[in-house]
A protein has these predicted regions:
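Residue-level signature of mid-helix packing/kink "hotspots" within the transmembrane helices
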Residues: 27, 55-64, 114, 148-149
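Membrane-interface helix termini in secondary transporters
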Residues: 35, 67-68, 157
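Helix-breaking motifs and short loop linkers at transmembrane-helix boundaries and internal kinks
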Residues: 41, 74, 95-101, 112, ...
Length: 198
């Protein structure tokens, strides 16, 4: 299949944005361990399960069927749908007032984020020659490190700023903890990336 000279690199930019958002969504919870434990009154073990099993186990298991789907159906729509789902689920974590609700949301994020790597690598292998492919893959893979670094650099001050603000009251939802507001801030921009990927 032939592509315009610009389109493959546009795809790499969008995929890299998606991978960056994915890394930020994964990392943000680790920056809010104290407030989440305090407000949900959960133990270290429960927090460890949120950070590990809730996301990693489902992410790993979902990678296999996601790869199968990427072979059979439109990779563009699989990626866009995955970004949309994990972004909404990250934002929906802002509504969690119970441990079980947050646990389920993180499970959903893990499953949704499993859609990106297999579809992205398959897409890039079609878009680029063997000579160009390593550069495209390298750019895409750098997103994880950039996302983690960005989350640490910006997320800490953001959460500290939110902690200093008066209680946030959202219509229908009610009072919102600062860490819940942080989930909204990092989750909603991903919806725009999903639109770019579609």
């Amino acid at each position: 299949r032939q592509f315009g000279a610009w389109y493959p690199w546009y795809a790499v930019i969008v995929l890299t944005l998606a991978a960056t958002i994915s890394a930020i969504d994964r990392q943000v919870l680790a920056l809010m361990i104290g407030p989440v434990k305090r407000d949900l009154q959960i133990s270290d073990t429960q927090m460890g399960l949120l950070l590990g099993a809730a996301f990693a186990t489902l992410h790993t298991l979902a990678s296999f069927p996601m790869a199968r789907l990427a072979d059979r159906y439109s990779r563009k729509w699989i990626i866009a749908g995955g970004i949309f789902c994990w972004s909404l689920l990250t934002a929906a974590s802002a509504l969690a007032h119970r441990y079980s609700t947050l646990f389920l949301a993180r499970m959903g994020v893990g499953v949704s984020e499993a859609s990106l790597p297999p579809a992205a690598y398959s897409m890039m292998s079609d878009y680029f020659s063997q000579k160009q492919l390593p550069l495209a893959v390298g750019i895409f893979q750098s997103a994880t490190f950039f996302g983690v670094g960005f989350a640490s650099f910006v997320g800490g001050p953001l959460i500290q700023h939110l902690e200093m603000q008066p209680a946030l009251v959202v219509p229908i939802v009610g009072d919102m903890y600062p860490w819940q507001a942080a989930f909204l801030v990092v989750g909603l921009p991903g919806v725009l990336v999903a639109v770019l990927a579609a």
